[in-house]
Regions:
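Short helix-loop capping/hinge motifs at secondary-structure junctions, enriched
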Residues: 1-9, 102, 214-215
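Immediate post-signal peptide segment of exported/extracytoplasmic ligand-binding proteins
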Residues: 7, 89-119
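Noncatalytic alpha-helical scaffolds and linker/capping helices
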Residues: 10, 138-139
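Detector for C-terminal structural segments
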Residues: 14-76, 90-93, 126-136, 158-285
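Hydrophobic alpha-helical membrane-insertion segments
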Residues: 77-87
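Short, well-ordered beta-strand elements
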Residues: 114-124, 145-148
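Short glycine-rich hinge loops at helix-strand junctions in the catalytic core
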Residues: 142
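Short helix-initiation/N-cap motifs at beta->coil->alpha
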Residues: 147-157
């Protein structure tokens, strides 16, 4: 949609989702904010661009935001635990103004007098408690925002036909990314039903996907994906949500396991074993 073409608009909308309030009020403080498309992995971009990433991204400069080369990688700002973070609201209003929208009579309007509106489409009642406060914050910004909940069949049909503005979804990426990146981020899949939900079309991203698919070493792949992560985050195509960086498991304490477990796998069915001594201690209590 044309109204979301300016990345300033997309960034401003994202500023109005208060993760810290949601985490404290709704999630018992159990989660961390997602900041990366490859969160908590060796492929997550961090800080300022490295010399290795610069070598990859320099030839693509004309396709990507200048901020990639001048600023640290984008991380959503931390909000105060109050429902509305006034600092982020002021920043969001400034971004809208820079994109040609001004506050008039409590509404964000362009030079034609059109009011900025948006709809968040949802099919799960479980997400009402998350979406509704976000809607309220967007209204405080001067946006005519609404939350529409429909059944899953209608939802699937509307998503496939691109009849939506904002939805809730996940970007589940592989730890060994390759040709499947075309389905999620390539211009080739922007106009057809695919995992490229936002219809992303960027020649620089397309080139990075091709580089990743043809990487020959793990080190090379990691550098390319860090470059891709940095680039995607600069485009503000999402409002990052949350994740849990640890496994939470309840178990009877008669098992043992290796000191060093795989980084992303609990290994309960692969590496744990029944410990007779622990079982005897437990049974004697």
């Amino acid at each position: 949609l044309d109204k979301f073409n300016d990345p300033k608009i997309r960034e401003a909308i994202g500023l109005m989702f208060n993760f810290e309030w949601s985490n404290k009020t709704l999630f018992f403080g159990l989660y961390d904010r997602v900041t990366s498309f490859w969160e908590n992995s060796a492929m997550q971009a961090s800080g300022r661009i490295s010399k290795e990433e610069l070598a990859i991204l320099n030839p693509l400069k004309k396709y990507l935001p200048e901020s990639i080369f001048s600023d640290p990688v984008f991380i959503p700002p931390t909000s105060k635990p109050d429902k509305v973070d006034r600092k982020n609201r002021r920043k969001a209003i400034k971004l809208f103004q820079d994109a040609g929208w001004d506050l008039a009579d409590g509404k964000l309007k362009n030079k034609k007098g059109d009011i900025f509106s948006l709809e968040i489409l949802n099919y799960s009642p479980a997400f009402d408690r998350i979406i509704n406060p976000f809607i309220e914050n967007l209204k405080l910004l001067g946006i005519e925002a609404k939350h529409t909940r429909i059944d899953s069949t209608q939802y699937t049909e509307r998503v496939r036909n691109f009849e939506w503005e904002i939805i809730t979804s996940t970007y589940g990426n592989s730890l060994t990314p390759g040709i499947e990146l075309v389905q999620q981020y390539s211009s080739k899949t922007a106009d057809v039903p695919s995992r490229n939900l936002v219809g992303l079309k960027n020649e620089g991203i397309d080139i990075l996907i091709n580089l990743a698919a043809n990487a020959t070493t793990r080190k090379e792949l990691n550098e390319i994906i860090r470059s891709l992560d940095r680039s995607l985050r600069s485009l503000h195509i999402w409002v990052p949500q949350w994740y849990k960086k640890v496994h939470t498991v309840a178990y009877r304490d008669h098992y043992s396991y290796p000191k060093n477990l795989p980084p992303f796998d609990l290994g309960a069915f692969d590496f744990w074993w029944f410990d007779k001594e622990k079982a005897e201690i437990l049974n004697n209590k």
